[in-house]
């Protein structure tokens, strides 16, 4: 289904591009030269915005948050990272191949020292549009406490352990006793 949808998108993009190219009378321009009213062609926009590795300036502190005693020069580095659009809100642009790159960075310890050292950073070499991970499933990996009467239970998100909202003392105050299996206050057994 996704392949068919992508194929339709590309076919439509190609038709629009060819139709526009047929009627445009654009003169060739030198590299770096821009027309005042230049219009970027649809296919160029589409290809440049689709999910792919793209050079991104990344703050070194984002990659090394524990190295707060240093000032880095430069403070950010150019890295290839996945970015772009996937043409479907259910998909996200994610890396499928990565590698490390080592760069020389000046590390400055204020009022003490400075030196050029090597630091390793992660780069993305391949990207794909893949289904977004279900955030609700990631946030709560625990199964439900009970299929019925869920409102009677409370669940510890760390251990997934279920316990009763009712307490034994609350049940006893009503001359009842807590049934720990159902989490209800029942009449005492005789």
From Swiss-Prot:
Disulfide bonds join 51-93, 82-127, 86-129. Residues 1-26 form the signal peptide. This is Vascular endothelial growth factor A. Belongs to the PDGF/VEGF growth factor family. It comes from Equus caballus. One of its GO terms (molecular function) is heparin binding. Glycans are attached at residue 100. The keyword Cell wall biogenesis/degradation does not apply.
């Amino acid at each position: 289904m996704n392949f068919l949808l992508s194929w339709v998108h590309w076919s439509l993009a190609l038709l629009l591009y060819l139709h526009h190219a047929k009627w445009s009378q654009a003169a060739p321009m030198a590299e770096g030269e821009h027309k005042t009213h230049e219009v970027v062609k649809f296919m160029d926009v589409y290809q440049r915005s689709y999910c792919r590795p793209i050079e991104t300036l990344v703050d070194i502190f984002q990659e090394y948050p524990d190295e707060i005693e240093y000032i880095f020069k430069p403070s950010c580095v150019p890295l290839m990272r996945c970015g772009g659009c996937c043409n479907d809100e259910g998909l996200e642009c994610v890396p499928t191949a990565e590698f490390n790159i080592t760069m020389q960075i000046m590390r400055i310890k204020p009022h003490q020292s400075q030196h050029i050292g090597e630091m390793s950073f992660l780069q993305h070499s391949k990207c794909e549009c893949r289904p977004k991970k279900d955030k609700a499933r990631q946030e709560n990996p625990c199964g439900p406490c009970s299929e019925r009467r869920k409102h009677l239970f409370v669940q510890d998100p760390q251990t997934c352990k279920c316990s009763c909202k009712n307490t034994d003392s609350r049940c006893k105050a009503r001359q009842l006793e807590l049934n720990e299996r159902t989490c209800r206050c029942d009449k005492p057994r005789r």
